[in-house]
Amino acid sequence: MDRLGFFKHGLSAATDVIGSVIGLKKAVNTFTEAVDEALSNIKSDIGLNLQSLQGDMCENPRNTLSEAARMGYTMIETASYSNGRIYDMKPDDFREAARKAGLKIAGAHLTKLLEDMPDATAESETDSAAAGEATTAEDPVTGWWRVALDIHRDLGCRYITMSRLPESLSDETTARYAEYFDTIGDMAAQRGMKFCFHPDKSHLTAVNGVSAFDAIAAATDPAKVWFEIDTYETAEAGIDTKALLRRYGKRVLLLHAHDYGVVGESGRIDFDPIIAEAVKRGAKDIFVEVRNYMLPPKNCVERSIYNLESLPSIRF
C-alpha cells in the first residue's frame, strides 16, 4: 500500500470511529431528552385547596386554574359556592375551565349551618332556578343540600367537606350536628360522594375532657361521615397529628398540608412523617392549603408544592 492509500485508509477508519462516536453521542442525547420529557410528565398527585388563592380565583379564575396546573397541581378542592355558582361561574363553565387547565375537581368545601336554615328555602329555590330545575316545597335542609350536592356531583367531585360549626357548642348542639352530618353523608353517598368533616382548632380542643371533634366522631356513622385533617389546626390545638391519624384510621380520607406560611418552611410542622402516617392509614388525597402569606399567594402556593414533592413520603 502506498502512502496515499495508507492515508486514505486511515482517514476512512478515523471517519468511521468519529461517526460512531457522534452517533453514540446523538443516541445518548436522544435518550437523555426522552428521559427528561418523561420525568417532566410525571406528577405527584397533590391537590390545592383554592382558598389558598381565593383573591386570584375571584379576579380571574381561568388564569388562576392554569397557573395552579403549571405549578404541578393535578387536582383542586373548591371553596366558593353561592346561588348555584362556583366562583361566580356557571358550574358547566367552571368544569370546562378546570378541564382545559388539566385539573380534576376532586372536592368542595360547602357550608350551611343549621342556624342559617330559616333562609335556606329561599336560597335552595334560587339555586334550583340557577341550575335550571323546577322548584317545589321541600324541607330546607334537604333542599339546599340536594341542589348543592347535585351540582358538585356533576362537577366530578368525590368529596364534600364542611369545616364550620356554631361558635357556641353545647352537648345538645354537638349532638344535633352529628345527626345533621349523618344526613348530609347519606345524601352525598346517594350521589357517589363522601362527606367529610374538617375540624379546626376549637373543635379539636377538649372541653371538660372531650373535644367537639371526638364527640361528633363517636356519634356519627362511620359509613356516612369521614374526616379531613388539617396539620395547621392540629398544631394550633396542640394535638399529636400522627396519633390522631392512628386513632381514626381509614375515616381520615383527606389531609390538608397547611403550615404557618409556605408549607414546609416554618420548621414547626414535620410533614414527612405525618404524610407517611396518613398514607399508611388510608388517606386518599393531600391538598395544600396556604392562609398565612409571607410572599404573594401564588409564590407561596408554588413553593409549597415544590417543598412537598421533595419529601420521601410523597409518591409519584
Predicted regions and their residues:
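N-terminal secretory signal peptides and thylakoid transit peptides that target proteins
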Residues: 1-17
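Residue-level detector of alpha-helical secondary structure
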Residues: 15, 19-22, 28, 32
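Catalytic-core regions built around general acid/base machinery
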Residues: 90-100, 180-188, 244-247, 273-278
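Active-site acidic/histidine proton-transfer and metal-coordination neighborhood
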Residues: 75, 100, 104, 113-227, ...
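N-terminal pre-domain/capping segments
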Residues: 30-158, 250, 306-316
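Histidine-acidic metal/acid-base catalytic patches
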Residues: 33-47, 58-72, 156, 208-229, ...
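A cross-family glycoside hydrolase active-site/sugar-binding cleft signature
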Residues: 47-51, 77-79, 106-111, 161-163, ...
